[in-house]
Amino acid sequence: MDRAPRISFTSLGCPKALVDSERIITRLRAEGYELARKHDGADIVIVNTCGFLDSAKQESLSAIGEAMAENGKVIVTGCMGAEPEQIEQAYPGVLSITGPQQYESVLDAVHRALPPAHNPHLDLVPPQGIKLTPRHYAYLKISEGCNNRCTFCIIPKLRGDLVSRPANDVLREAERLVGAGVKELLVISQDTSAYGVDLKYAESPWKDRQVRAKFLDLARELGELGAWVRLQYVYPYPHVDEVIALMTQGTVLPYLDIPFQHASPEVLKAMKRPAAQDKTLARIKRWREECPDLALRSTFIVGFPGETDADFAYLLDWLDEAEIDRLGCFKYEPVAGATSNAIANPVPEEVKQERYNALMARQQKISARRLKRKVGTRQQIIIDEVGPTVARGRSKADAPEIDGAVYLSSRRPLRVGEIVTAKIERADQYDLHGSVAGF
């Protein structure tokens, strides 16, 4: 082969999987492989799959099928690869199937099918690695796996128990990213607030001090690097209360992504989730008293087996009181291997849809009410996209792709990644509108 070997890559699923894809691509680029924009222009295709829900598995199978049709040489990795039988049955011609985080196995499969053109040269890639996100923000994965055993979830089966990175390893990566121009670090894992439990909060050397592998300590150190720090996938352990002070001080963004999943004590017990939602409401109230700018994002499941009309009504009432700023909702799907499949009294599909519609309608009103309070205020906005007359950005209350946006007019040209102060002039159900202040 006279040219460098070319790889096409499809990455599906959550931000954790996206980080896995970035690591694989970084290693391949260091070995001289080039990235092709289309499958039919590549020598081989890698598909990083999602296997959490049946709908995600179908999307993964469709992506594998497209790669097989357009190229024919396909390596499959990711969460669905942890249970390869369905892939093998549908596409027996794939070259290799591996589970999540098996970077070396993916590289070995690539080497067997498409040897590198030359010896590795690490200077082919920037020191912070290859990123699949825009230049101004990056996902920072601090651990793998999860020690919780929620009945609807098979992530521990796919990704194993919690394995945290040493604090100095995380901080070195974060510092490289900020040095390369990243303005926002999105801290992710399966269970961000459990960070360091497996390490027994061991210290590691960083700069002129020792830093514990602990949620609060890591958040504090990340906040000293000069970028926005956004905490996502936070399980509501009691020690989460401690990080609110960092938000009040401006060390990290006043934003918490906590997947509460439900509010009814009976449903939460069936899910094996924290069930004292009356105490959670009291905590939310304290958090907002301490940090009035705090934005809360959460996800909820409707139609969980055994969920009654009373359980769902309890959830709606709880949402009215909690006033979650940003909300995602899923209709329950039975997942192969999940213990929730054995719970009695499954909810009919039409009832799931009715409850989904009702919850999202309720949340739309809550969101509109909370956003309306921001009209007339000044907010810091990070610019994601620049158009001819209007730029699209996000406030500190908005994570990329999953939350709302802020649409801005400006008398001067704006740049992607720039952080500006804007006056908020109008709000709708999910988004804000305004203009860059001072011009």
UniProtKB/Swiss-Prot annotation:
Residues annotated to bind [4Fe-4S] cluster 1: C14, C50, C79
EC number(s) recorded for this UniProt protein: 2.8.4.4
Catalytic reaction list: L-aspartate(89)-[ribosomal protein uS12]-hydrogen + (sulfur carrier)-SH + AH2 + 2 S-adenosyl-L-methionine = 3-methylsulfanyl-L-aspartate(89)-[ribosomal protein uS12]-hydrogen + (sulfur carrier)-H + 5'-deoxyadenosine + L-methionine + A + S-adenosyl-L-homocysteine + 2 H(+)
Cofactor note: Binds 2 [4Fe-4S] clusters. One cluster is coordinated with 3 cysteines and an exchangeable S-adenosyl-L-methionine.
Subcellular location: Cytoplasm
Residue ranges of every copy of the MTTase N-terminal domain listed in the record: 5-115
GO biological process terms held by the UniProt record: tRNA modification
SMART domains recorded: Elp3
Entry's Gene Ontology cellular component terms: cytosol
Pfam (any one): Radical_SAM
Location of the TRAM domain: 372-438
Cofactor: [4Fe-4S] cluster
Location (main, coarse): cytoplasm
PROSITE patterns: MTTASE_N, MTTASE_RADICAL, RADICAL_SAM, TRAM
UniProt record similarity statement: Belongs to the methylthiotransferase family. RimO subfamily.
HAMAP family in the cross-refs: MTTase_RimO
NCBIfam families attached to this UniProt entry: 30S ribosomal protein S12 methylthiotransferase RimO, MiaB/RimO family radical SAM methylthiotransferase
Known role: Catalyzes the methylthiolation of an aspartic acid residue of ribosomal protein uS12.
Name this polypeptide is given: Ribosomal protein uS12 methylthiotransferase RimO
Gene responsible for this protein: rimO
